[in-house]
């Protein structure tokens, strides 16, 4: 834990200008575009979620270092028995994901590296992200904030396990979050939202940052 990197350190404006309000940037891929990504990911042995997670990490790394930690919102419905999937409730949990991006690595290698780390984390979800942040703070002797979030609900509705963990029209309101990248599949299309806290970044950063995600 003591060797885990901090959150991405993007250029920010003065703290006195920060407000607890978010703006939303949205985008969408067509059914054909999204199906092509899903099929390509499957052929390479990676998940579509990890593809988009890697794109998000790469975008942040353009304004930060290649080594940082991200806050992942996970659907964590324990397999106690078959009846668990009939229960309506909040089964989301947090994972703090280590990211180490080498500038000379090819894209598929970066995806596989992130996927390996994520799968390793999932094997230890009893010690979730909240516990990790608390332990890092204890070891480093400081309050730790991982305000860059990635939230995926890909395939949740298809699997019939939940109604989804993302509300397409509901903007993030959590003050400990700077950017929440949300992805979901709706009627065969990919919908993605970026909820960005106002007063954290200058407009000169926000537009290129989101555009790099859209165009990658």
Regions found by a protein language model. Give the residues of each.
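His-Asp-centered acyl/peptidyl-transfer active-site segments
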Residues: 6-12, 19-23, 31, 40-53, ...
């Amino acid at each position: 834990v003591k060797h885990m990197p901090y959150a991405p350190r993007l250029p920010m404006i003065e703290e006195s200008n920060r407000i607890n309000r978010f703006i939303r940037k949205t985008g969408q891929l067509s059914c054909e575009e999204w199906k092509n990504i899903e099929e390509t990911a499957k052929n390479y042995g990676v998940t579509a979620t990890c593809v988009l997670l890697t794109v998000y990490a790469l975008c942040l790394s353009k304004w930060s270092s290649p080594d940082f930690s991200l806050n992942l919102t996970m659907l964590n419905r324990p397999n106690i028995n078959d009846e668990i999937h009939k229960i309506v409730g909040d089964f989301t949990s947090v994972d703090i994901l280590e990211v180490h991006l080498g500038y000379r690595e090819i894209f598929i290698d970066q995806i596989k590296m992130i996927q390996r780390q994520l799968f390793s984390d999932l094997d230890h979800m009893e010690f979730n992200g909240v516990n990790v942040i608390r332990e890092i703070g204890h070891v480093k002797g400081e309050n730790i904030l991982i305000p860059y979030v990635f939230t995926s609900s890909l395939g949740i509705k298809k699997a019939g396990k939940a109604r989804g963990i993302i509300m397409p029209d509901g903007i993030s309101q959590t003050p400990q979050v700077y950017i929440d990248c949300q992805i979901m599949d709706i009627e065969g299309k990919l919908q993605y939202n970026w909820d960005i806290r106002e007063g954290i970044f200058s407009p000169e950063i926000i537009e290129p940052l989101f555009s790099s995600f859209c165009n990658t």
